[in-house]
Curated annotation (Swiss-Prot):
Domain of life: Archaea
Family to which this protein belongs: Belongs to the universal ribosomal protein uL22 family.
InterPro entries tied to this protein: Ribosomal_uL22 (IPR001063), Ribosomal_uL22_CS (IPR018260), Ribosomal_uL22_euk/arc (IPR005721), Ribosomal_uL22_sf (IPR036394)
Protein known as: Large ribosomal subunit protein uL22
Subunit structure: Part of the 50S ribosomal subunit.
Keywords for this protein: Ribonucleoprotein, Ribosomal protein, RNA-binding, rRNA-binding
Gene source species: Metallosphaera sedula (strain ATCC 51363 / DSM 5348 / JCM 9185 / NBRC 15509 / TH2)
MF GO annotations: rRNA binding; structural constituent of ribosome
GO-annotated biological processes: cytoplasmic translation
UniProt entry tagged with the keyword Ribosomal protein: yes
Pfam family, one: Ribosomal_L22
Keyword Ribonucleoprotein set for record: yes
Function: This protein binds specifically to 23S rRNA. It makes multiple contacts with different domains of the 23S rRNA in the assembled 50S subunit and ribosome. The globular domain of the protein is located near the polypeptide exit tunnel on the outside of the subunit, while an extended beta-hairpin is found that lines the wall of the exit tunnel in the center of the 70S ribosome.
HAMAP family: Ribosomal_uL22_A
């Protein structure tokens, strides 16, 4: 496995909470849009937004990889995008990483209300290659793609 580190940010290590999830069985394309939406938000605000998207009360805007994503009437105008979706599986894993980073920050004694999503990113993970047997001795490739999620929350 290749060496991996968090990005070097100009933040004191005692003032941030970090979390990473490796090889999550989630689409990188969905994760990209989820990460872009909550980057820079307050942690409580981000969790509330993700909860509204899970309940389909508000659509998650799609800036990229939006081919076929229809326009949604419940997207806020602040996003300046019309197309969106409800990527529930991606939100589930991002929320888990966000909660882990929040718990790590609380363990360092940081104030929960002042925490902000300083860095969040999604990267391609490993590809699990499988073959599905078919009729007449043939086989079809089946690729399970995974993704990595990294979150850093810091006190503002």
């Amino acid at each position: 496995m290749a060496a991996w580190n968090y990005p070097i940010l100009s933040l004191d290590d005692s003032r941030v909470g970090k979390a990473v999830i490796r090889n999550a069985p989630v689409s990188i394309k969905d994760l990209y849009n989820v990460c872009k939406a909550i980057r820079g938000m307050n942690v409580k605000e981000a969790q509330a937004f993700l909860q509204r998207v899970m309940e389909e009360k508000e659509a998650l805007p799609y800036w990229r990889y939006d081919h076929g994503a229809s326009h949604k009437s419940n997207i806020s105008r602040k996003w300046k995008v019309k197309s969106g979706r409800y990527p529930k599986k991606a939100i589930k894993y991002v929320n888990k990483a966000l909660e882990n980073a929040l718990a790590n920050a609380q363990g360092k004694g940081l104030d929960e209300d002042k925490l902000k999503v300083v860095h969040i990113a999604a990267h391609k993970g490993i590809i699990i290659k499988r073959f599905m047997p078919r009729a007449f001795g043939r086989a079809t490739k089946k690729y399970n793609r995974t993704s990595h999620i990294e979150v850093i929350v810091g006190e503002v």
